[in-house]
UniProtKB/Swiss-Prot annotation:
<dbReference type="GO" id="GO:0009378">
    <property type="term" value="F:four-way junction helicase activity"/>
</dbReference>
<dbReference type="Pfam" id="PF14520">
    <property type="entry name" value="HHH_5"/>
</dbReference>
<protein>
    <recommendedName>
        <fullName>Holliday junction branch migration complex subunit RuvA</fullName>
    </recommendedName>
</protein>
<keyword id="KW-0963">Cytoplasm</keyword>
<dbReference type="GO" id="GO:0006281">
    <property type="term" value="P:DNA repair"/>
</dbReference>
<dbReference type="GO" id="GO:0006310">
    <property type="term" value="P:DNA recombination"/>
</dbReference>
<dbReference type="InterPro" id="IPR036267">
    <property type="entry name" value="RuvA_C_sf"/>
</dbReference>
<keyword id="KW-0233">DNA recombination</keyword>
<feature type="region of interest" description="Flexible linker">
    <location>
        <begin position="144"/>
        <end position="155"/>
    </location>
</feature>
<dbReference type="InterPro" id="IPR003583">
    <property type="entry name" value="Hlx-hairpin-Hlx_DNA-bd_motif"/>
</dbReference>
<dbReference type="InterPro" id="IPR011114">
    <property type="entry name" value="RuvA_C"/>
</dbReference>
<feature type="region of interest" description="Domain I">
    <location>
        <begin position="1"/>
        <end position="64"/>
    </location>
</feature>
<comment type="function">
    <text>The RuvA-RuvB-RuvC complex processes Holliday junction (HJ) DNA during genetic recombination and DNA repair, while the RuvA-RuvB complex plays an important role in the rescue of blocked DNA replication forks via replication fork reversal (RFR). RuvA specifically binds to HJ cruciform DNA, conferring on it an open structure. The RuvB hexamer acts as an ATP-dependent pump, pulling dsDNA into and through the RuvAB complex. HJ branch migration allows RuvC to scan DNA until it finds its consensus sequence, where it cleaves and resolves the cruciform DNA.</text>
</comment>
<dbReference type="Pfam" id="PF01330">
    <property type="entry name" value="RuvA_N"/>
</dbReference>
<keyword id="KW-0234">DNA repair</keyword>
<comment type="subunit">
    <text>Homotetramer. Forms an RuvA(8)-RuvB(12)-Holliday junction (HJ) complex. HJ DNA is sandwiched between 2 RuvA tetramers; dsDNA enters through RuvA and exits via RuvB. An RuvB hexamer assembles on each DNA strand where it exits the tetramer. Each RuvB hexamer is contacted by two RuvA subunits (via domain III) on 2 adjacent RuvB subunits; this complex drives branch migration. In the full resolvosome a probable DNA-RuvA(4)-RuvB(12)-RuvC(2) complex forms which resolves the HJ.</text>
</comment>
<feature type="region of interest" description="Domain II">
    <location>
        <begin position="65"/>
        <end position="143"/>
    </location>
</feature>
């Protein structure tokens, strides 16, 4: 089990980051709520990871805090929720926002998340509400998670909008929907992370 990685950020391709650790490169998928807070390329970072082994792949999911990883693990315990959907859910909302939505039974907020229909939203509330009691009130999440700052340089590549749209598709949105929202959001001077952040806000 790989539980934590400490290394240098080599490449960022939302929602995936490539870390160099001891001469090896690790591809780590992260929810966008965590991805936004990564340092710039060339800087060192510590990521808490969840390791998934499948017949056709070995996957690493990364988080800035242990509490976010704990929530991810609670999500994948829920019937019908796999790692990909859990990643999409935590990209559409911060950990704190999700816990509060479940505690308050805000089905209308949950169904706006990629891949979450009414039945799945209801299942999340029924199966997770008791398990998540006290998570926010006991300060298990940092207040900073509610609004994370952008930490990326402005866009320079002409295909940045395409990169942002690809990231949204990877998170579960339909290609046409992703392209349409990105075309409305993207403006000169915005980073890829900024475009994704604003797109997710408008979709949720």
């Amino acid at each position: 089990m790989i539980g934590r990685l400490r290394g240098v950020v080599i490449e960022k391709q939302p929602p995936e980051v490539l870390l160099e650790v001891g001469g090896l490169g690790y591809e780590v998928q992260m929810p966008m709520s965590c991805f936004y807070d990564l340092p710039e390329i060339g800087k060192e970072v510590t990521i808490h990871t969840h390791f998934v082994v499948r017949e056709d792949a070995q996957l690493l999911y990364g988080f800035n805090h242990k509490q976010e990883r704990a929530l991810f693990r609670e999500l994948i315990k829920t019937n019908g929720v796999g790692p990909k959907l859990a990643l999409a859910i935590l990209s559409g909302m911060t950990a704190t926002q999700f816990v509060l939505s479940v505690e308050r039974e805000e089905i209308s907020s949950l169904i706006k998340l990629p891949g979450v229909g009414k039945k799945t939203a209801e299942r999340l509330v029924v199966e997770m509400k008791d398990r998540l009691k006290g998570w926010v009130s006991h300060d298990l999440f940092s207040p900073a998670e509610i609004s994370l700052p952008a930490r990326e340089s402005v866009l320079r590549a002409p295909d940045s909008s395409e990169e942002a749209a690809s990231a949204l598709v990877a998170l579960g949105y339909k290609p046409q929907q992703a392209s349409q929202i990105v075309s409305k959001i993207a403006k000169e001077g915005m980073s890829v992370e900024d475009i994704i952040r604003e797109s997710l806000r408008s979709l949720v």
